[in-house]
A protein has these predicted regions:
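Charged, amphipathic alpha-helical segments and their flanking helix caps
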Residues: 1-33, 43-136
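Interfaces and regulatory segments of ATP-dependent nucleotide/adenylate/phosphodiester-chemistry enzymes
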Residues: 38
Length: 136
């Protein structure tokens, strides 16, 4: 049986929860209010069906958006550098369980992109998107 989108999002949230001080959500939160370690949430970009015979492989592409503190602060920039590194970063956390608790066959964090700023709550925050491909 193929995993549901909800199961995959919850699995991604669980992996993001392993990062100290990062507040992870299974859906985009109503308000952008990064804590000390920022916030992260998955958004489903696409689904490809019939990747193998029958219903053998369904490919889900997610964007994990990470929003950290005010862009002008040095600590925020250092935190972003940490999240982009492998050892303590988003990639290591997500790829730490490539089955997302047994609901996926495997996954890969393909890239980090769109490193930029976003305005919310009269504040400019630093943000980055991670592309995650999940094979379920």
């Amino acid at each position: 049986m193929t995993a549901t989108v909800t199961q995959l999002k919850n699995g991604l949230k669980t992996r993001l929860d392993t990062i100290t001080n990062l507040r992870a959500f299974a859906q985009q939160p109503d308000q952008v209010n990064p804590s000390l370690g920022g916030i992260a949430f998955p958004t489903l970009e696409s689904i490809t069906y019939h990747g193998a015979m029958g219903n053998g492989l369904v490919t889900h592409v997610f964007t994990i958006s990470v929003i950290v503190g005010r862009a002008a602060e040095r600590t925020t920039q250092n935190l972003m550098d940490t999240y982009l590194s492998f050892d303590d970063g988003i990639r290591a956390a997500i790829e730490g369980d490539q089955t997302l608790g047994g609901v996926a066959q495997t996954l890969i964090v393909e890239e980090a992109s769109n490193i930029s700023t976003v305005d919310a709550n009269d504040t400019t925050y630093l943000t980055v998107d991670f592309r995650v491909v999940v094979y379920a």
